[in-house]
């Protein structure tokens, strides 16, 4: 009886330990020094080789980025809340430097907690447009290269589900922007809403060497969501 009681107490103790809430923790200082390094910035230059744009990224994706909502449609992986690819690795800071000058100039006016992507120089290379992703959507911003200042142009209503949501026009002053229509139907969450039809797959045809594709449209709900993009 004593041996059986001891075993029972041990098992009970193990169960209690296993159910403890464990939070995210930092590794030791030695490991952190090796893993948590600062990435070198990526560089983009104008064709006249007068200015360069330095783009800085986090070494790793944040927990918020890894935990974001993801919808898989027709080979795309998007965030249905922000309407941009869920696989984007964002830029968090921008600096400008004259090629003939060693000093880097911090771009002023950038959004707080910047999540920047879709960087594009204007045709005359005097301005740089980019998008910033908020918790609700995607905004359009523009930088004046000579003064290294950024300014927001739109609210967070851009449609970046199918690539860059804007294009520069030849006049260097106009941007053609894709925005979400106000009457766009809401995307259907397969995990919450009743699907519009069953999942259907076919096995007709003969064997072939064709490649396979991920995240194909599987039912009427997927089709409706893809049309809404």
Regions found by a protein language model. Name each.
Residues 1-22:
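Bacterial Sec-dependent N-terminal signal peptides
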